[in-house]
Amino acid sequence: VLKKGLFEHGFFDVICCFHTLDHIIDLESFIIEIKSLLNKNGQIFFIVHDTNGLSVKLLGEKSPIFDVEHIFLFNKKSLNKFLKKNGFSNTRVFSILNTYPLFYWLKIFPIPNILKTQLIKIFELSKLGYIPFSLRAGNIGVVASKRQKE
């Protein structure tokens, strides 16, 4: 939990938040506090869900990113705009490549349980389920710099 006064202003070179921004109620205050904690050359590295990602394209509203706990949702354009508006520059937004065993992808994919159970058995017997599989499933990352005062 980020609390005001926990760290001195300008304390950090880099601040990372992975799947955090989408859960913050007062995002404007949070990003202002993050910015104040960065030193003058400080950078951020965030990862969030992508509303234009593959999971949304394949699953629509059934995509796991549409969750009551996700207060804010972003795509590359909206994340870039939000950060620039809040004093960040040199913003680079990019897709994240996720690598998990085929078992994981199968378990989270919304298919009928009877089919899923059969596929899991096949994957177990054949050992296919342990094969790592990489996919740009619907996460984006961003690296940005604290904008210098002009």
Give names to the regions the model predicted:
Residues 88:
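Short phosphate-binding/catalytic loops that engage adenosine nucleotides
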Residues 1-58, 73-85, 138-149:
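Conserved SAM-binding loop
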Residues 32-36, 63, 105:
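Residues in and immediately flanking transmembrane alpha helices
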Residues 92-150:
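A C-terminal cap/extension of S-adenosyl-L-methionine-dependent methyltransferases
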Residues 59-60, 107:
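A generic structural signal for secondary-structure junctions
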Residues 60-63, 134-135:
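Short, flexible turn/loop "capping" segments at secondary-structure junctions
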Residues 62-74:
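Short, contiguous acidic/charged loop-to-helix segments that flank catalytic cores in large enzymes
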